[in-house]
């Protein structure tokens, strides 16, 4: 399904010295090289540059921006490519696709999936991407059994600038992005910022999406060293569209029918829906990137990161057994009620942090990387029932029917090298050791 979009933008740049900026540009170019494939790596891959991304960046999620790369399939719950979208490569789902940003793992530590809805308009802050198809090179985070998507954020701008981009299209789909940057200050400092809003009514009925995000970056550069602090966040509110209509429902109610949130049908045959059948989530990401060039042959990358996620989704459920939610049956007019309609909330409060590194060597016929990382995830997931239809008795709005806490520590180290045997023949080796310790403790009502 195609979504028609119209875009417009305004950009203002100031001038700066080419000599001042050359050193900073060179430093930024050597970042995040250890997890990338090259022409001599025995891996199928596609590089997507900034210019290519800009041509298709009208607000849709990153899976849709990658939809024209080989062996890629994308889906969208709302039908507009915004909100809950998925990416498959060579038939492999998102749980087997490794995603990194600046070499830092982005996959959810428990499900191994990546929820792109929590990274709205992130492509506006991406310099380039590499998609590796099949089992890719050693990387950080979830195993890359099906594919890898390696993203590198924009480098610091050497010139002051201000930029606005907007687009509008089908189903009231819109995107507004504001970007500003200071350019190079005192030959050492740079600061950049982005604010974005994206929304759509969705192709599917009531599949509305409201997304807000920001991206902040500050950098300090010397002759051979760079330090960058990056903070980005996404806040989303999406109406559920993941229930999916059956063939029979679409034949009766139309292709855009959305069964999510349906409560009842009145005497006139009109269906009524629950207004708060929404997913609400805020995810904040922080990255501290350090790069040092020792010589033309040696460079070191070290990164620390922290991600905080907090949110919930709420839904109307009809005819549910009360005992499943830790509630006792109640009596109305002498009849015991064991099943009733209710509203439930599933909440989460998750934290993920750690560090990654890579030491890279390139000279003559040999290129090699020694890298790895150590990360820890702590999850706190729980469910509540704030309302039960016709409930008799006391019901706390904070009534909890399950809670589970998890802790996952993941460490890995890898060594890979490429050696040119002759002009047209090279040898490649890639070794990795990974250790995971995962514990979970839960209880049901």
Model-derived segments and spans:
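Short, acidic, small-residue-rich periplasmic hinge/interaction motif at the N-terminus
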Residues: 15-55, 94
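Extracytoplasmic beta-strand/coil segments of soluble accessory domains associated
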Residues: 63-105, 127
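Non-catalytic regulatory/gating segments with a bias toward low-complexity or hydrophobic composition
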Residues: 66, 129-130, 149-151, 302
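Short acidic/polar hinge/loop motifs at secondary-structure boundaries
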Residues: 88, 105-133, 152
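Transmembrane beta-barrel wall of Gram-negative outer-membrane proteins
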Residues: 161, 168-199, 204-241, 288-296, ...
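Outer-membrane beta-barrel proteins
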Residues: 167-175, 194-221, 261-291, 340-354, ...
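Acidic/polar loop-and-plug regions of large Gram-negative outer-membrane beta-barrel proteins
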Residues: 219, 226-287, 314-342
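Face-selective signature of the C-terminal outer-membrane beta-barrel domain
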Residues: 281-445
């Amino acid at each position: 399904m195609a979504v028609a979009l119209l875009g417009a933008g305004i950009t203002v740049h100031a001038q700066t010295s080419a000599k001042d900026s050359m050193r900073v540009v060179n430093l930024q170019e050597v970042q995040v090289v250890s997890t990338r494939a090259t022409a001599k790596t025995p891996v199928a891959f596609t590089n997507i540059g900034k210019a290519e991304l800009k041509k298709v960046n009208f607000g849709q999620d990153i899976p849709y921006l990658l939809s024209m790369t080989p062996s890629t399939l994308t889906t969208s719950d709302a039908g507009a490519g915004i909100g809950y979208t998925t990416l498959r490569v060579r038939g492999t789902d998102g749980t087997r696709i490794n995603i990194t940003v600046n070499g830092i793992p982005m996959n959810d530590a428990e499900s191994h999936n990546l929820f792109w809805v929590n990274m709205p308009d992130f492509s506006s802050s991406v310099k380039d991407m590499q998609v590796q198809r099949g089992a890719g090179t050693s990387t950080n985070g979830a195993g890359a059994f099906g594919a890898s998507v390696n993203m590198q954020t924009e480098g610091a701008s050497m010139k002051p600038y201000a930029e606005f981009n907007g687009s509008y299209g089908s189903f009231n789909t819109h995107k507004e992005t504001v970007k500003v940057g200071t350019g190079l200050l005192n030959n050492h400092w740079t600061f950049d910022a982005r604010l974005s809003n994206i929304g759509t009514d969705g192709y599917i009925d009531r599949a509305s999406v409201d997304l807000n995000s920001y991206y902040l970056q500050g950098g300090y550069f010397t002759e051979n060293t760079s330090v960058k602090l990056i903070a980005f966040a996404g806040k989303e509110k999406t109406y559920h569209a993941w229930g999916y209509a059956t063939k029979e429902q679409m034949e009766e109610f139309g292709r855009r029918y959305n069964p999510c949130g349906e409560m009842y049908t009145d005497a006139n045959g009109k269906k009524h829906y629950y207004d708060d059948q929404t997913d609400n989530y805020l995810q904040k990401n922080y990255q501290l990137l350090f790069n040092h060039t020792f010589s033309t042959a040696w460079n070191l990358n070290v990164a620390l990161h922290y991600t905080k996620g907090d949110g919930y989704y709420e839904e109307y459920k009809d005819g549910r057994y009360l005992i499943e939610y830790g509630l006792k049956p109640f009596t109305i007019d002498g009849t015991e009620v064991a099943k009733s309609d209710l509203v439930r909330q599933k909440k989460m409060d998750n934290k993920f942090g750690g560090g990654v590194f890579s030491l890279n060597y390139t000279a003559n016929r040999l290129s090699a990387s020694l890298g790895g990382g150590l990360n820890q995830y702590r999850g706190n997931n729980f469910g509540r029932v704030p309302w039960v239809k016709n409930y008799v008795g006391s019901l706390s709005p904070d009534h909890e029917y399950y809670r589970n806490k998890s802790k996952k520590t993941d460490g890995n180290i890898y060594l890979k090298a490429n050696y040119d045997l002759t002009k047209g023949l090279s040898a490649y080796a890639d070794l990795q050791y990974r250790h995971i310790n995962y514990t979970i403790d839960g209880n049901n009502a």
